[in-house]
């Protein structure tokens, strides 16, 4: 498999592309059954995650680590073809973000950023290959009138990659304090003036084994 194969796999997106239409219709149906006073949120996998999903279709049995490494290797192999492909993906995500807010009527978008793990990209590669797309999509969320929730995925992160440019486009910031190397207190310093969203472990601990009292105490 080569970057050329990837390039040929990625389509151009429009407002009426089937996958976008389907997502908006599904979102509308969910909102129809929700409390009208509820604060609502759509989710977008970030540029890095959305960019690896096509790689999963390029071969049988590729696991997560393999496609993560393929993305890095392909970018180092043929930067132009990969960035052209990723631009098309980002354009589709911008359209979906806008339609989430303007057409479906959600209040916010939870943007799940990925790529800051030091095991994959260098700081320079992240800044060149991932960050510009992240910011483009986050700006589309803001321009559409929605609140932007930035989630910083995974462990082993260089949290400094999510710098003031990310902060400027975020209303709320969230990360896994149980795995990312940053406490809530340090996060408040890195993202001054932003709402910090905490959370609990979701694969073990009180959410899995505790009762209501345990959950309340942990919160």
Stretches with model-predicted labels:
Residues 14-219:
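Active-site loop segments of alpha/beta catalytic cores
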Residues 1-18:
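Alpha/beta catalytic barrel-like cores
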């Amino acid at each position: 498999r080569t970057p050329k194969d990837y390039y040929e796999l990625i389509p151009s997106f429009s407002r009426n592309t089937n996958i976008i239409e389907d997502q908006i219709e599904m979102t509308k149906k969910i909102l129809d059954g929700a409390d009208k006073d509820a604060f609502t949120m759509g989710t977008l996998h970030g540029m890095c995650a959305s960019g690896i999903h096509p790689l999963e279709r390029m071969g049988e049995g590729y696991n997560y680590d393999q496609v993560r490494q393929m993305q890095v290797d392909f970018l180092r192999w043929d930067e132009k073809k990969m960035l052209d492909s990723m631009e098309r993906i980002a354009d589709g995500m911008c359209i979906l973000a806008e339609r989430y807010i303007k057409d479906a009527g959600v209040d916010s978008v939870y943007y799940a950023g990925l790529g800051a793990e030091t095991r994959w990209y260098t700081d320079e590669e992240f800044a060149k290959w991932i960050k510009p797309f992240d910011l483009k999509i986050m700006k589309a969320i803001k321009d559409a009138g929605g609140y932007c929730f930035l989630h910083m995925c995974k462990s082993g992160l260089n949290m400094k990659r999510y710098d003031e440019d990310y902060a400027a486009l975020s209303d709320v910031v969230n990360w896994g304090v149980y795995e990312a190397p940053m406490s809530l207190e340090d996060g408040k310093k890195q993202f001054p003036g932003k709402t910090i969203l905490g959370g609990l472990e979701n694969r073990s601990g009180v959410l899995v084994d505790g009762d209501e009292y345990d959950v309340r105490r942990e919160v």
